[in-house]
Each structure stands twice: as C-alpha cells, then as structure tokens.
Amino acid sequence: MEGAKGPRLRGFLSGSLATWALGLAGLVGEAEESAGGTEEEEEEEEEEGALCTEKRFLRLIDGALLLRVLGIIAPSSRGGLRMVRGRDGPAACRMWNLCHLWGRLRDFYQEELQLLILSPPPDLQTMGCDPFSEEAVDELESILRLLLGASVQCEHRELFIRHIRGLSLDVQSELAGAIQEVTQPGAGVVLALAGPESGELVAEELEMQLRSLTGMMSRLARERDLGAQRLAELLLEREPAHLLLPEAPANASAEGVSHHLALQLTNAKAQLRRLRQEVEEKAEQLLDSQAEVQGLEAEIRRLRQETQALSAQAKRAELYREEAEALRERAGRLPRLQEELRRCREKLQAAEVFKGQLEEERVLSEALEASKVLLEEQLEVARERSARLHETQRENLLLRTRLGEAHADLDSLRHQLEQLVEENVELELELQRSLEPPPGSPGEASLPGAAPSLQDEVREAEAGRLRAVERENRELRGQLQMLQAQLGSQHPLLEEQRENSRQPPVPNRDPATPSALHHSPQSPACQIGGEGSESLDLPSPASYSDITRSPKCSQAPDSHPELESPLQMVSQDPQTSDQALQESDPTVETHQCLEKSGHRVPLQSPIVWDPPQGPEVRIEVQELLGETGSREAPQGELVHKAQVLKQESPKCRPRSAELTLREPLKDQKALDRELELSKQQKETGRHEQRPKGLESKLGPQKPQQTSEGVPDAWSREEPTPGETLVSAIPEEQALRDEVAQLRREVAGLEVKLQAQAQRLEARSAEALCLSEELAQARRTEAEAHQEAEAQAREQARLREAVDTASLELEAASREREALAEALAAAGRERRQWERDGPRLRAQVEAAEQQVQALESQVRCHLEEAEREHAEKQALREELEKAVLRGQELGDRLEHLQEELEQAALERQKFLQEQENQHQRYRHLEQRLEAELQAASTSKEEALMELKARALQLEEELIQLRQYPVDLATGARAGPRTVETQNGRLIEVERNNATLVAEKAALQGQLQHLEGQLGSLQGRAQELLLQSQRAQEHSSRLQAEKSMMEMQGQELHRKLGVLEEEVRAARRAQEETRGQQQALLRDHEALVQLQRRQETELEGLLVRHRDLKANMRALELAHRELQGRHEQLQAQRANVEAQEVALLAERERLMQDGHRQRGLEEELRRLQNEHERAQMLLAEVSRERGELQGERGELRSRLARLELERAQLEIQSQQLRESNQQLDLSACRLTTQCELLTQLRSAQEEENRQLLAEVQALSRENRELLERSLESRDHLHREQREYLDQLNALRREKQKLVEKIMDQYRVLEPGPLPRTKKGSWLADKVKRLIRPRREGALHGGPRLGADGAGSTESLGGPLETELPEGREADGTGSSSPAPMRRVQSSLCLGDETLAGGQRRRLSSRFPGGRSSASFSPGDTPRQRFRQRRPGPLGAPSTHSKGSGVEWDGSIKTLSEHEADDTREAFQEQKPEKQFLTPSLSQ
C-alpha cells in the first residue's frame, strides 16, 4: 500500500479524470476541503502533502461525491440518492456506496443510452477494504471514465460541458479521448443494444462488427473463467480446518498401543463400549434426523407445489398481461397511426398548397423577368438616344464653326475666280503674241516614250504595298469570321437585339426636306452610312460619264439603280444635265440610295455638284478623266475585291449593332474602323490605277479630253519611285497600327460578349434552380406518400412480430413447464435415493441443489418482475411522449392558425398598399390639374396685366403726343410750368423704359410658362397612362384577392376539419389515459402480490439457512463418526471380521460413488436445459430490442418529414424575398423610364428646331447650287475658247514636262527665264508650289467641306474631292475619331450661333490634319511628300493642295490680298486649334 500511495496515487490525482471529478464538487454543492477549511488546516495541508492527497483520493473513492454527481446525471434512475455513512465502518459504507453507484450507472447506460457495459464490474471488496492499492485505483479510474461518458450524454450535458471547457487544454484533450472511448460502441467498452439490422449493413461492416463481437466474447469468457476460479478459491477458504483435529488422538493411541499393549486392549474395550453407546445415540439421532428430513421433504414438497401453483398462476398472469399489453398496444397504436396518417394528409395538403404558391411565385417571377427585359430594352434604347443627343450637341458646335469657315472660303474663292479670270485674259494675250504651234507636232509620239519608265517605277513601288495590304485584309477577314462564329453561338437574346438593331424606326421622308433623312438621330443607317457619306467625292460634271464606268461605281447598278439616272443624265449633255440638276435635286436621290444601301463604300454615296472655279476646275476634271480611263484594265479584279469587302462589312455590322446596346461609343469606334479598313482596301485599287491615268493623259484623246488633260498634267506632280516608297511607309505603319487597335477592340468585344453570356447562364441557372426546387417538392410529396405506405406496412409487420413474440413466449412457458416436470421427476428419483439412511450426505446435497434451483427460480421471477417494471416504465414514458406529441400537435395547429392569420394580415396590408397607391395616383392627378389650372390662371393674369400695361402705355403716349400742344399753350403761362412739364416728361420716359423692360421679361416668362405647360401636359399624359396601368394592376390584384379569399375559406374549412381531428385525438388520448390508469392499478396489484411473495421467499430463505446449518452440523458429526470408524478398522486390522466389514463398507461406498456420478450427470443435463431456456429468453429480449429499433426508425422518418416541410417553407420564403426584390427593381426601372421619356421629349424639341435650321440651310444650298451652275456655264464657255490656244502648245509639251519633273526633284522655286516658249507655265507651277508650303507653315490650309447631303461642297471642286482622298487613303489620321464625329454630324441638325450666322452641315477638317503632320524641322521636299504621297493619295492630296494653291497663287499676284487672307487665317486659327488634335489622334 505504501508503494501505491506514492507516484501512482499522485499521478492519478493529477490526471484529467480526477481533476474533472474533484472540480464537480462545486456543481453538487460540496466545497473542497482546501477551500472550506480554516487557515490552520491549510497550513497543515501544506506541511503534510501526502495526507492531502490521501484525503482527496478517499473523497473520490468514498462514493458520496460520485453519487451526487450521478444524481444530477440520472435523477430518475432507480434507487434514488441513498448514501450510508458510519453504519458498519468506512469500508462497509464505501462498498455500499460504490455498489449503489455501479448499479445506477449500469442502469443508466442500459435504459437511457441503450448501451451495454462490456467491461467487468469493479472489485468492490478491494476498493472498500484496500482503497490505496493499484487495483482499487484502476477500478476507480474505470468508474470515473464511465461517469464522464454518462455526463456528456445526459439531459444536463451543457452544464458538464461548460465545466470541461473551463479546464486547461491538456485536460480537455485527455477528457475528449476518454469520452470517445466510452461513447463509441466500437471501442470495446460499450455495446449498442439497438443497432442496425444485419440486412441493412454492408459485408465489410458486418465483418468488422463480427470481429469486434468475437473479441468481446473471448474477453468475457476469460473474465468468466477467472471469476469462477476466484469463487472456487473463496469457497475452499471458507471450509473449516477442523478435518485435521481427529487425527491427533489416533496418532496418540497408535503410540500407546506400541508402548502398552495391555493398556491398549483395555482402552480398546472401553472405547468399543463407548462407541457402541455412541452408535446407539447416533442411531437415535439418525432416526430423529430421518424424521426431520422427512418433515423437511414434506415441507419441500409443499413448497414445490406452492411454487408450481404460483408459477402456473404467474404464467397465466403473464399470458393475460401480455395479451392485455398487446391489445393495449394495438389500441394505443391505432390512434397514433391515425394521427400520423392525418399528419401525412395535412403535410400532403400543405405540400399541395406550397406547390400552388410555388407555381404562382414562378409565374409572377416570369412575368417580372419579362417586364424587366422589356424595361431594360427600353432603357438601352433611351441610353443610345441620349448618347446620340450628346454627339449631336458636339457636332452642332462643330458644324457652326465650319459654316463660318465655309462662308469665308466662298468669299475667298470668289476673289480667286476674279483673279483667275484676269490671269486667263493675260495668258490669252501672251499665247496670241508668242506661240504659233504647227499642226503636226512630233511631241505626241515622243511623249508616250518617256512616261512608261515612270509608270513602271510607280507600279513596282505600289505592288509591294498592295500585297502587304492584301495580306492584312486576309488576316482581318479571318478575325471577322471568327468573331462572327463566336457571336453566332451566343444566346438568342443577342439575335433579338440584332433584329431590333436591323429594324430601326425610320422617319417620314419629305421631298421638301431631303437632308432630314440623314439628320434623324434615331436612324442607325445614318450612323453607319454617314461614314461613307462623309467621305464622298464631288466630281466635276465632265467626269460623270467616267465615274459610271469606274470599278467602284460599277457595283452600284446591282444594288442601287437609282444612282445611274442622274449620272447618265449628266453624261448626255451639259445643258440637259444642268436642267436635270435644277429640276431634281441630286442630293435627294443619292440620300435615298444611301438609305437603301445601308453600309456602302464612299463611291456609292450621293454625288453633289459644285461649280468649277477657274483653271483649277480643268485640272480636276482632267485628272478624273485620266483616272477613269486607266481603271478599265484591272476592273474585274477590283470589282471582285470590292464585292468581298462588301460581303464582309455587313457581317460585322450586326455584331456592332448588338454591342451598341451595351457600349455605344466603343462599338461605334470599332464599326468606324472596320469601314475605314474597307475604304482603304478599296482605295488601293484606285492608287494602282493612278499611273495608268498618266498614260491615258499622255496618249491621244478626244479634243475636249486633251484640252482638259494638259492643265491636269501641268498641275499634277508625280514623285519618283523612291519618294513613293518613302511616302508609303508611314501609311503602311498607320494601317498596321489601326489593325492592332482593331484587334484589341475585338478582344474587348469578346470579353463583353463572354460577360453577357455569363449573365445569361446565371439567369438560366436560376431558372433551373426553380425547376429543380419544384421537382424536389414533387419528389418530397411522392416520398411522403411512400413513407405513409411504408408506415402502414411496418405497422402490419410489427403486429405480426408481436404475434410471433407472443407465440414464442407461450412456447417458452411450455418449455418451463416441461423443465418443472423434469425437476419433479428428478425429485422423485432423489426421494428414492434418500430412503437409504446411510446416504444422508447425498440427500442433503440433493436438498441443497433443490434449494439452489428454487433460488434460481426466485431470481428469475425477480428478474422478470424487474423487467416488467422496466417495461411498465417504458410504457409510461411512451405514454408521456405521446402526450407531449399531442401537445406539440396542438402547438403546431396553433402555429398554423397564426400563420394563416399572418397571411390574411399580409393580404390586407397588400390591399391597403394598393389603395394607398390609387390614392397617390389620384392625388398626383389632382395636383397636376391644380398646377395646370394655376399655370393657366397665372398666364391669364400675366396677359391681363400686360394688356393693362399696354393700355396705360398707350394712354401715356397719347398724353405725350398731346403734350407738345400743351407746351405751346403753356409756354406762354410761364417758365415754371415748362420745368415741371419737362420733369414729368423725363419721368414718363423712364416709366416707358421700365415698362418695356418689364414687358420683355414678362414675354420671356410667358414663353417659359408655355414650355412648362407643355412639359406638364406631357407629365399629365404620362400620369394618365400610369393611372390606367394602376387601374389594370388593381383589377388584377382584386382578382388575386378574390382567389386568395377563396383559398382562405378553403383553409378555414381545412382548419375546421383539423380541429375536429384534434378533438377526436384528444378523446382518444383521454381513453388511452383511462386505459393507462387501469394498467397502473393492475400493476400496483401485481406489485403487492410480488411483495407478498418476496416476504414468503425471505421466510423460506431463513428456514433454508437453518436447514443448512443443521446439515453442516450433521456433516461434521458424520465426519467424526467416519474418522472413529476408520480408526476402529485400523485397530482391527488383524481381525478378519473387521476386514470383511471394511470391504463391504468399501463396496457400499463405491456404489454410492456411482450413484453420485449419475446424479451429477442428471444435474448437468438440467443445467444445459436451463441454459437453453436462458438463450430463448435472450432471443426474445433481442427481438424486443429490434421492435424498439423499428420504433426509433419510425420516429426518425417522422423527424425527416418535418425537416423537409421546414425546408419547403424556407424555400417559399426565399421565393417571396426574390419576388420582392424583383418588384423593387421593376419600380426602379419604371422611374428610370419616366426620366428617359422626359429626356426624349426634350430631345425631340431640339430635333425639331434642328430640322427647321436644316431646312433653311437646304434652301441656302439650293441658291448656292443655282449660282454654281451659272458660274459653271461661264467657265465652259471660257474653256471652249482656250481649247484652240492649248492645241498649239503640244509641240513644246515634252520640254515642259521635263522642266516640270526637274522642278519636282529640286523643289526650289526660282525664277525661270521667259525667253523660251512656255516659260509662263513653269512660273505657274512655281506659284502653285510656293503657297502650299507657306499655307502649311501658317497652320495648314483652310478647312474644306464635304459629306453626303452637305451643301458647302458647292463652293468649288477642291472641296468636292477632298474627303474622298482623305478618308479612302487614310493618310490624314490613323484613328476613326474624325470619321465617328463627322458621321454623327450627318444625322443631326444645326443650332444657330450667338451672332445669328448659319453654318453648313457635314464640314470636315482636312487642313487641320495636314498642319498637325508637319514639324518645324522638315525640309520642303519632306513637306511636299507629306502633302502629296503620290498616286496613292492623289485625289485627297491634290484637292487639299490645290485648295491651298489658290490661296498661295493669289498671294503672289497681289500682296494686299495675301495680307488680307493671312489675317483671315490667323483669325480662324484659334477656332481650328481645339478641333485639330481630336481629329488627328
């Protein structure tokens, strides 16, 4: 014990289990001794630590603290809280407390937790007698571990868990491991009584379970063997040691015989006498004992008969009780099953209701989604219009600035025309004086010989560029096809948007306002087609016949036959073309062609005529003639390329139209760039045909063409192949930059499409979730039906199982009766054996065995009584649970009623909200009417006041008119009256001025009020529409209200049915309570009977103990007699009689041994039969456990059904919340739509104003067109006069061309000698080259004007060809920003400037681009190449350069006019600077 007191005891007390158990003293009301003692005790404990540990250990092993803890864990377990202190000493108290603790703990595990403790029971004797031993410590540790497992599984487990959390982390981890060992059935400490059936387990789980069970059985068998061995040792120790006492006198007599034989004989005789006397006494005692034994046997027979009668009665009582229990169980299960069926029906009805609600919510959500989609579409359309509005505002500002510049350009062009006329007159005079050309000049033959070298060089230079551009075009086509394939695989919503974008609202066409077709902000065709119309060329009238034959225009008759009629009319006759142009405006026809074509190239845009101005007209006409003549050779190839590009460009447009719904500005950029690429690709054919134009100009032509071709050759400057390659490099780099930017934008568009696809997938996923929830609700409904059917089947199976169990019990009772009969037969046989007197020992042993059998039977009866008691307790608990379930059902019914009331309240609230909305609408209508009335009354009052003021002013004017007459008469009166009248006159004038100002302010207010009145009327109309919608909504809500009322009535009816069912359930519950009370009364009677039997059994046990004591005394006496008899036989060894007697005695003993062996075999047979009966009882208990498990499964299924119902309720609540969110989003969208409609009305007002301004501008354009036609006729007449003079100059043509080429290479404007013929042409070329540089240094040439439907292009041919070259060539800018801005300007109107001056539409900024491309350190040659990139940019550069040419030529002719133009350019420069960077970026 000293060894156990050392480290083992300290280690146990410092462990987790002891710490936890000692810490529970505060929970049970005990304070630790260390906290409750005085200071002196604390000092003693500090001095004596060993004593403190012993006290703490004794406090644990005493059992009192653990019993209190167990009272908290299992307050309802049998036995109650009973502790014994100091009755029979501390050891006995400890043993009794620990025994009580173990019994209650074992019952708690078996009854409450349904677990069987597999560990052996603790050695309570060791723990009570030797508490400080290692065995006692181990047993206490196992008890504490089981107590810990029970504490975390009881009803007050939260209290114990909170206490465990208050300990350290190490202790918590150790306690968690101990809890896991105790609570898990597979750990080997406990075994689950109600486990799953073998059919429900997998083969592997079955194998694992069998292995664990075999291990447990082997361990239990070993423990059983050890216990039996220990019990045998204890029984051997209990036998007295008096068997050795008779041997002492025998040894002494033997010694006496050896020493004194004589004395030995005398002593033997005396002993014989004494022995005879003792034998006689013993015979008497044997007779008495036989009589007593017979009496005992009679009593035993009587007891057996009584026990048999009692057992028969007990069996009958058991049968009756079992039958009554079975009937009661059936009767009790019927209402419960009916209740469960009713609950299932209610759940089915609730599921149907939830299903209907889910369908309604789904329909409502679909309607809300549809309305949301419509509102989003309207919102996108409104956003697009607002974006167009902003663009129109910007373009209006640009157009106003451009109109002023165009007017200035017209003035300068008129001045130039006058100067050109004077110069032409001078040139005619010089030609008449100096030149006399012979008719047959050899220059015509030599001229083509020099041109081919330059033409070949240009073709070689352009071939490389064309190949590179074609490669880039192929790459772009592949990218566009990939994008188209990706877009085609998107959601059908994009296709609907594409169809909406393809079918925009087209405004009404009015022949009086032809330009309105392109200025409507609602036409996408204007947006896209405007790019082509911005970049149109306006050729001279002589080139109309050639334009119709060009490759670009050759495509027009296929899709646009309207474009042929004006061109053919112009090509027939100049006079007829003039008449046709005057009668029918070509802009109208070409605009119609544009709208029909949609998205075409620039040459298919409308052609607007502009009057030629001077010799520049001849140059442009001849240039166009040369181009169209040289394009006929590769026409087929270019037509094929243009058709491919046309087929590709519409493929891109639907994609851009789709994406404008999301990002209008970015998509417009992408579309502009795609169209610009198509224009550049088509312009390459035009550049390739430029050298052929030179050849056609140099060859023999018709008189009119040759006469126009000479000035074109003079003004045309062809660079060398090296210069052409140098100029092609920046253009190619710009094209590559545009291609890279297009690729980036395409990637951005793909990202946006992917995001949109993800949003569509999210919406489809939501729809799928809703459908899955609906399907799940249907599945749960079907499962509920199936579970109800399964419950019915299980109930039938339970009934069958109960019947089989009753049959098995009857069989067991019959087997017990058979055992009793076998025992009676064994008793009869034993009676036969007990008739022999000498065999008393065998009879006593048989009596002991019979008594033990009776004890075992009594124990069986007691165990059965305990089982019946436990079953009754279980029945009570089930009845209590049934009562609780009935209460829960009542609570649920009340909860359902509350939910129905809440639903009714919600409907009332919803109806009230609808009424409030109606009242709000009515209030708004009243307010609008009041505001309108107030506005009308205020206007009327203001008008009345104005009229009154006007009348007052008229009266005062009349007075003032009469005042001079009064003055004339009053002057005679005196000077004082004159002064007073003068003061009055001044005051009257002041009053007049104030009245005029007030009148103007009132007029402004009146206009403002009229605008407000219009807006209020629009709002009133919107409110009327909203009120109509609200009325429709209210009608729908009233219909829904009627439906909800019908549903409410149906629910009330169902509620009445449920209440009736609840009443029936309560009546059934009362009946079950009555039955339960009857059962309790029967149980009390049985308990009293059992108590009486227990008292009788106690009396029998007392008598049995007395009989045992007598039997032991008889056995002692018998042993003494046997010893003496053996001594006598030893002494009479020499006597033959004694030997014969001894042999006979031995034979008898052998026969007795044989009989005893037979009895032992019979006993073994009876024990085997008893074990079989116990096995049958175990099987019956197991089947009962299975029935309990099935009952638990039914409960779990019911819990699952309730959980599914709760999930359905949660899903319905989520759907309601989502519908509320959709309502809120719909309200927000309606407000946004109202705001957008207001913006739309404002935009429409502005558009009307712009249309009026456009109409005024179109009238001005017509006037300018008429003037230009007149000036063109004048120029035609002058050109016919010049033809005769120009034919004489062909002989010196070759020399002049060489001089011009030298002049191109040198680019140094020096004076040429006038001695040679044609020197005035070189001077002319110098004058044309010089101002181009000077114009660039001054900030670029003035801004030209172009565009489809624009009328500022009528100012001259330099403006007609300018946009074509700029836009088609792409040299001016590498970004589509100018195209986008100019395109937006085609679809919008103008606003008047501050000064009232009107400006023209569709003007462009070519000069800004060229000026931005120059740098201060450039040489004149570089600047010339930048302005004139060669044949590739011939139209644009030439027209741009020619526009500056005439400014410069004017400067060389007259210096004062040059100063004026420079001042005009300096005045226009600030306006251009803020627009040029945006166009050249």
UniProtKB/Swiss-Prot annotation:
The UniProt record lists the keyword Cytoplasm: yes
Composition bias, Basic and acidic residues: 660-695, 1453-1472
Polar residues: bias regions: 542-557, 568-590, 1371-1386
Listed GO biological process terms: cytoskeleton-dependent intracellular transport; defense response to protozoan; positive regulation of cytokine production; positive regulation of T cell activation; positive regulation of T cell proliferation
Main location group: membrane
Cellular localisation: Membrane; Cytoplasm, Cytoskeleton, Microtubule organizing center; Endoplasmic reticulum; Golgi apparatus
Modified residue annotations for Phosphoserine: S441, S649, S1353, S1384
UniProt keyword annotation of Membrane present: yes
InterPro entries: CH_dom_sf, HOOK_N
Coiled coil: 200-225, 258-491, 731-1308
Region (Disordered): 430-458, 494-731, 1331-1481
Disruption phenotype: Mice show defects in T-cell functions including impaired maturation, significantly reduced activation, reduced cell division as well as impaired cytokine production in response to specific or non-specific stimulation and during the course of infection with the mouse malaria parasite Plasmodium berghei.
Organs and tissues of expression: Abundantly expressed in immune cells, including both CD4(+) and CD8(+) T-cells and in myeloid cells (at protein level). Expressed in endothelium (at protein level). Expressed specifically in spleen, bone marrow, lymph nodes and thymus. Expressed in liver and heart.
GO-annotated cellular components: centrosome; cytosol; endoplasmic reticulum; Golgi apparatus; membrane; nucleoplasm
Keyword annotations from UniProtKB, A to Z: Coiled coil, Cytoplasm, Cytoskeleton, Endoplasmic reticulum, Golgi apparatus, Membrane, Phosphoprotein, Stress response
Membrane topology: Peripheral membrane protein
Entry function: Acts as a positive regulator of T-cell maturation and inflammatory function. Required for several functions of T-cells in both the CD4(+) and the CD8(+) compartments and this includes expression of cell surface markers of activation, proliferation, and cytokine production in response to specific or non-specific stimulation and during the course of infection with the mouse malaria parasite Plasmodium berghei.
Subunit structure of this chain's protein: Homodimer. Interacts with DOCK8. Interacts (via C-terminus) with intact microtubules. Interacts with dynein-dynactin motor complex. Interacts (via C-terminus) with HSPA5.
Similarity comment text for this entry: Belongs to the CCDC88 family.
Name of the protein: Coiled-coil domain-containing protein 88B
Gene name of this polypeptide: Ccdc88b
